[in-house]
Every structure is written in C-alpha cells, then in structure tokens.
C-alpha cells in the first residue's frame, strides 16, 4: 500500500537492492541503478497514451508491451519447441483479449482474487478447490537444487573462482550460499543471478580466450 506504480513495475525483478549490490560487487564494477536501468518503463507509464489509465492498467500495459513478448512468451516457445511441443495461449486470443481489455478493474481483481469475472463464470463447472486456487507459475526448483550437495559444491567452486574474484567479494557470495543451504534464508534468486553470470562469462570470455 502506498507504493508508487513505478516501484511496482520492478516487482519480482528486484533481486538485489542497491545496498546489497554495493556489498557484493567490487568497487571497480559500476553500472546504473535498477531505477535508472528501468527509466524507459517509467517514461512509458507517464507517456500521453497511458496518462488516463489507472495504476493497475498502466502496469498491465507495460507487461503486455515488454514482459510478455520479451520474457514469458519467449521462454514458453523455446522450452516447448525444444521438446517438440506446440503451446497455445488462449487468454491472448484476440477476441478474448479485446473483451478483457474493456472490463473494469473490479471485474479483473476483487478482494485480492485475480481473474475474478473468469472464476465467477466457470465456478459452476469446477470444483471449489480448483476455482479458488491461487495463481501459479512454472518456477524452476532452484531453491531446492541449491541446497543439494552436488549443486552446493559446484556453486562453491564457481563462487571462489578467479573469475568470481574479479567482480565480487567472494566471502559475501559464500555467505549467501551458506545461509541458503542452512535454511537461514531463501537466497536462491540472488545466488542464481550470480551463478548464471559466471557461467556466461566463463563460456564467452574465459573459454573463448584460451
């Protein structure tokens, strides 16, 4: 409550706050803040064609313009095609979308219930448990993986590598990893972000330069 719509746009993509980044990154590693990097989204929210929209509609508009085509639809397409599957997204059918776009906010979310009008329409055909189930994505179980011994050792090796020392305070990385393994915190997304960077860096810079 009270959070600016600009901050809400960042949402779950906000993995490290600026203070945390300062703690794990070495001084020579600099870059724009999350707010600076996402300034184009803020500008989109304030642009004339979105000026009359409510906050929720602004967020939906940015999601439709960026998150769907640039992230979630790409992942669904790549992963399904890699397994010879053809995936469809019925809620993005043009007629369904046009109808949903004209609905008032109260028909979309009511008392914390998402897809309210849709759930209401199918309630007599579905079991109550199914109809009232919270929205679920398709998350990869990285939280579990990173607590397994083989994964823990692999990540430890990467977090203490010469490449990691070039960019990060490795003792801070190990603290994140150990706190996660000991179930003191869920640092899975923070660990995963650094891990994927190090694998990418090794593949395209370290390995290629040998």
Question: Predicted regions: what is each one?
Answer:
Residues 1-210:
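Adenosyl-5′-phosphate
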């Amino acid at each position: 409550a009270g959070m600016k719509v600009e901050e809400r746009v960042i949402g779950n993509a906000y993995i490290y706050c600026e203070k945390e980044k300062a703690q794990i990154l070495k001084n020579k590693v600099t870059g724009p803040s999350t707010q600076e990097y996402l300034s184009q989204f803020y500008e989109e929210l304030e642009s004339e064609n979105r000026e009359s929209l409510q906050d929720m509609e602004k967020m939906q508009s940015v999601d439709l313009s960026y998150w769907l085509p640039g992230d979630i639809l790409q992942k669904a397409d790549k992963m399904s095609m890699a397994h010879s599957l053809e995936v469809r997204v019925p809620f993005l059918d043009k007629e369904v979308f046009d109808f949903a776009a004209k609905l008032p906010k109260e028909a979309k979310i009511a008392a914390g219930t998402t897809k309210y009008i849709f759930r209401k329409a199918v309630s007599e055909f579905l079991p109550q448990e199914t109809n009232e189930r919270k929205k679920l994505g398709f998350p990869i179980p990285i939280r579990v993986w990173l607590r397994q011994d083989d994964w823990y050792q692999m990540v430890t090796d990467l977090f203490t590598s010469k490449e990691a020392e070039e960019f990060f305070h490795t003792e801070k990385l190990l603290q994140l990893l150990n706190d996660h393994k000991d179930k003191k915190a869920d640092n899975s997304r923070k660990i995963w972000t650094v891990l994927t960077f190090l694998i990418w860096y090794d593949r395209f810079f370290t390995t290629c330069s040998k």
